[in-house]
Amino acid sequence: MENTEASNLIGMAQLAQLKPTDLRGKTIFIRCDFNVPLRNTSKGLYRVADDTRIRRFLDLTFKKIHELTEGDCRIVIGSHLGRPHKKKDRSGWDGVFNIQFVCSHFDTLVRRVYGDTYTIFPPETLDSHMKDSLEIVAHKRLPPGGIKFLPNLRYLLDPKNTDLYRKEFITKLADIADVYINCAFS
């Protein structure tokens, strides 16, 4: 691939054309569509009720990335989940739309196929301090084979986050990612 800014935008149609050198050792930001239904368990936790979108991503995009890199890459995953809203007392976000529930299920599915090749790093926060979630990647602490889940991307819409904050987050994400793959419209 050409080493231009435009070459960092990889769509599904172009993924098949990539070579190992395009992705090996790189940090890949993947915008996924993991907006999946959740169900409440008897213990008050939530579980993925239908993992079709997650499995489709693993069977297509993730499989191709693994074939090209054999785990020698760093992956940052961003997705939204539902439409989170503030708690009635405005103390924080309703935890129902915590991407952690998706992250746990994703980890289970990845381990079944790839064993310990990949290490999943869940989001640290339920709230909208999303820039903090990029620190592990920005400071090169995400190891090869590391997959970092960002908090629910809809948290960026928190009214306390200014447009400047959102731009800073996007700029920081662009600085750490070598490649962008958009799978959010599958």
Where are these regions (language model features)?
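Active-site loop-to-helix "anion-binding N-cap" substructures in soluble metabolic enzymes
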Residues: 1-186
